[in-house]
Amino acid sequence: MSLFDFFRRPTSAPVARERLQILLAHERAVIGRSDLIAILREEILAVIAKHVTMEPEKVNVKMERGDTVSTLEVEVEVPTSATARAGKKVVEAA
């Protein structure tokens, strides 16, 4: 980069291309959000089902996207009888 290039205004094509790439990335993130949540919910249900018998309706998955941080919130209602059985399995395994 020479000294003369430093004071030159950037051409509009690269700026427009960069803005378009940002816009497309944002659109893809918004469109794919519902699919991602459904996939995560099914995988979380599969993992929980390995250890506890429960109803799939008792699992809520929610994703919130902010400007800088995305948050995944998972709420699971585990029956008290299931936690007692899981504790016995851990004791028996030891």
UniProtKB/Swiss-Prot annotation:
It comes from Beijerinckia indica subsp. indica (strain ATCC 9039 / DSM 1715 / NCIMB 8712). One of its GO terms (biological process) is cell division. Belongs to the MinE family. The keyword Cell cycle applies. Prevents the cell division inhibition by proteins MinC and MinD at internal division sites while permitting inhibition at polar sites. This ensures cell division at the proper site by restricting the formation of a division septum at the midpoint of the long axis of the cell. NCBIfam families: minE (TIGR01215), PRK00296.1 (NF001422). InterPro entries: MinE, MinE_sf. This is Cell division topological specificity factor. Gene3D superfamilies: Cell division topological specificity factor MinE. Keywords: Cell cycle, Cell division. The gene is minE.
